[in-house]
Amino acid sequence: MYPSIEDDDDLLAALCFDQSNGVEDPYGYMQTNEDNIFQDFGSCGVNLMQPQQEQFDSFNGNLEQVCSSFRGGNNGVVYSSSIGSAQLDLAASFSGVLQQETHQVCGFRGQNDDSAVPHLQQQQGQVFSGVVEINSSSSVGAVKEEFEEECSGKRRRTGSCSKPGTKACREKLRREKLNDKFMDLSSVLEPGRTPKTDKSAILDDAIRVVNQLRGEAHELQETNQKLLEEIKSLKADKNELREEKLVLKAEKEKMEQQLKSMVVPSPGFMPSQHPAAFHSHKMAVAYPYGYYPPNMPMWSPLPPADRDTSRDLKNLPPVA
């Protein structure tokens, strides 16, 4: 029932009994009489079953009071409370202040030395089974504020991000960049006015301007298409005119060649006339048909309209 004690110099018996099932401890009262079996030790029955709301996964903070020390005045026996490290097993870290009742975690150690002094056995960096850490340098208010900041869904309204790597800081930087973009967009849409702060109004103006520019671009595309068609038609007319010009140029060259082929006498040239006295005894010179002397000028042929005699009665008077 009791753990074996091998060290006789420093006797330590954490005599804690589980009374949650209703079993009575025969040593449930303080045994300080000399006639008892264990003359130098006392026992105390405790309830080791923790309520559901008092169980924590981890703890990290200030432990204000875990066990209270007391002094018994029977024969100079001094009792000091110590932490039952075998009764609790907490892990990881917990931000907050743990309020723990003393009668649920305390064991007792008795000594027969009259000069003994009440002593609270507590390790600085380790309280429960070497797992729970106590930070005595931080205040309760700072721990509570940190706990509320981490557990609550609200963000702290600070001017600058204390932790650039946190999600709240990244979100704040993203929102600031987005607001700057909206301000730039408002300045571009209305250069002469003060930038708007209403994001919905800025988006409405942007949609209106985009639709207007899209309509103007469509009209310009149609106008450009019409101009391209006109350019094509003008190019075709230009090619036709160029062909006609070439034809006219060829006709002009042909006519010039015909004119050059006709011999035209100079105005100072006159045919030599021989007087009849010198040729009276001679016969007239007869030329064959179709032969013309080389120096004799030629008459140009009459046009067909002048050679037409069907309209002579109308054009000429009958007397003639």
Swiss-Prot record:
Residues 299-320 are annotated as: Disordered. Coiled coil: none annotated. It comes from the Eukaryota. Residues 162-213 form the bHLH domain. Its main location: nucleus. Expressed constitutively in roots, leaves, stems, and flowers. Keywords: DNA-binding, Nucleus, Transcription, Transcription regulation. CDD domains: bHLH_AtILR3_like. One of its GO terms (molecular function) is protein dimerization activity. Disulfide bonds: none annotated. GO terms for cellular component: nucleus. One of its GO terms (biological process) is regulation of DNA-templated transcription. It is found in: Nucleus. InterPro entries: bHLH_dom, HLH_DNA-bd_sf, ILR3-like. The keyword Secreted does not apply. Residues 305-314 have a biased composition (Basic and acidic residues). Homodimer. This is Transcription factor bHLH34. It comes from Arabidopsis thaliana. The lineage of its organism: Eukaryota, Viridiplantae, Streptophyta, Embryophyta, Tracheophyta. The gene is BHLH34.
